[in-house]
Regions:
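Glycoside hydrolase catalytic-domain context in secreted enzymes
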Residues: 1-332
Length: 332
């Protein structure tokens, strides 16, 4: 069932998302997002709530059609994950043309309108405005404008260029229905052998903090709004000090060392991201080794599972109240 544009008795126009002929509070455009969300949550089943807690990879069909077979990476048909599993957050991979991207996004939203409460889909993406083509890390620009990698942008040493890039990328994302960015990556690569440096902005904590502020301003604006692209900043609390330069995507690269009290140095850009209102935060796959804060040992447990890191530090000490997004397939 597709929702209809209806008129309430008082003349308010609204979209009847659940098709019951009544303007329920979550459909009332006059209410705040918080009020509408509270009403919607009270209507959802446990299964529907569970579906909203996951985000998976999704792929386009030919020329923007919905892919109804398993893809190269996505494991289920599109209708299965939306109508069957109640999922509404997806990380899009290859987009061949802007037309296909926009057409696919519209098709996806029309499918989501058939769910019991008409919850729209949120599409996210890894960086896709530069040259690197490495699935799970970044995509080359393709139909989007092409810019230097983040390390190259940082090397220009011009915050206005960073802000302009982010604003242009925001507009291009919105044009094809992408409203969430799985970036910026603000890790400080203090281990020069680490293989994920190209998507960082270097190892100067103060300068990276300034770049982060400009980046978030370009994508999100002064505050999240209808024209924003919501950013998920990564990889909390800093994914750069990888032991021997290995990477935590692999079991042999999970250890992160902070010699000489460098943990706070790596944390500095994330403090700025929180101050600037980043919508999301992504912990890394890695785990701290031999780390103490204020004389208290930090458990040698993966950051995304680490209560001392996610709850005590990120939520309580730093006051982050946005969405925590785990890195991909943390549980599989």
């Amino acid at each position: 069932m597709q929702p209809t544009l209806s008129t309430a008795p008082d003349g308010t126009r609204f979209r009847d998302l659940n098709g019951n002929g009544v303007m329920d509070p979550y459909e009332d455009p006059r209410l705040t997002p918080e009020e509408r969300t509270a009403d919607l949550l009270a209507r959802l089943s446990l299964e529907e709530k569970a579906g909203l807690m996951f985000q998976t990879v999704i792929e386009l069909g030919d020329d923007g059609d919905l892919l109804e077979t398993p893809g190269a990476i996505s494991k289920s048909p599109t209708s299965t994950v939306i109508l069957g599993k109640g999922m509404s957050h997806f990380n899009v991979h290859h987009i061949p043309t802007a037309r296909a991207g926009a057409r696919w996004s519209n098709n996806l939203q029309r499918l989501a309108e058939q769910t019991p409460h008409g919850i729209p889909v949120t599409i996210s993406t890894d960086p896709r405005h530069a040259f690197v083509e490495n699935t799970g890390v970044a995509f080359s620009a393709g139909p989007f404008s092409q810019w230097p990698e983040p390390m190259g942008l940082a090397a220009l040493d011009d915050l206005e260029v960073i802000r302009t890039f982010a604003d242009v990328a925001r507009q291009e994302y919105c044009a094809v229905g992408i409203r969430a960015a799985l970036h910026p990556q603000i890790d400080l690569p203090t281990e020069p052998r680490w293989g994920r440096q190209a998507q960082t902005s270097g190892y100067d904590a103060e300068r990276v903090s300034q770049i982060t502020a400009a980046y978030l301003e370009g994508f999100q604006g002064d505050a999240l709004g209808p024209e924003s692209v919501a950013c998920t900043t990564k990889h909390f609390p800093g994914g750069g000090p990888q032991r021997d330069g290995e990477d935590a995507h692999f079991p042999y690269g999970r250890e992160q060392d902070y010699p000489g009290g460098m943990f706070e140095y790596h944390l500095a850009p994330f403090r700025e991201a929180i101050r600037r209102g980043t919508a999301g935060m992504m912990p890394y796959y890695g785990m701290p080794v031999g780390l103490e804060r204020d004389g208290r040992p930090i458990d040698e447990v993966g950051f995304a599972y680490n209560r001392q890191i996610v709850t005590d530090l990120l939520r309580e000490e730093l006051g982050f109240d946005g969405v925590v997004v785990t890195d991909w397939e943390l549980v599989n």
